[in-house]
Amino acid sequence: MRNKIKLKIIVIACFIFSIIACHFSPETQKSISPALSFDSTSLKARILQYKTWTLVNAEPVKMSAFMRAACADVREEIISPHFDKYIRVYVNELGREAMFKEENPKFPIGSIIVKEKLPAKDSEDPEFYTIMVKRENGYDSVNGDWQYLTMDETKSRIEEPENISSCQSCHAPYNDTSDYVSREYLHLEGRRMQREVKEK
């Protein structure tokens, strides 16, 4: 009788241990961290690695007048709609597939898009950065659960812009077509490449 009780205890203990081991396995931990951690420290650390991500446009793309004006509302002292501005865009691995999907992309949680805002096409020194982070469901469902951030030219300060409604209103028209991501730079890049092919 005692042996049967001991055997049951051993079986139950093994079962519980297997569940715990599975839950805390390295594979499971890898899938939930650090890519889906949104505390300011880990998020900043990921953003600062953006140069190792996929470069979306091979060359800086000239911003449209609409985009320049929208960004001017965020950083008026630097960006002016009266001067040409260029952007260079990077996307992390989580958002890469959605970025290049032709129709109705859905960016997964943890996707990050970094835009370098350049004063000239040949500039290597961005004057500031705008950032989109796809947050967890329910973070801001009205605006597609995207978090909008800016980063100064020194990369030392990452924060939400004071006039965040400017970012939200700029991206709102793209909610049904590309999950609030304009991807205008992809189309501009494509037209530039087509022109180069025709000229050859």
Label the predicted regions.
Residues 26-33, 37, 52-63, 99-200:
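Sequence context surrounding c-type heme c attachment/ligation sites in exported
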Residues 31-103:
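N-terminal secretory signal peptides
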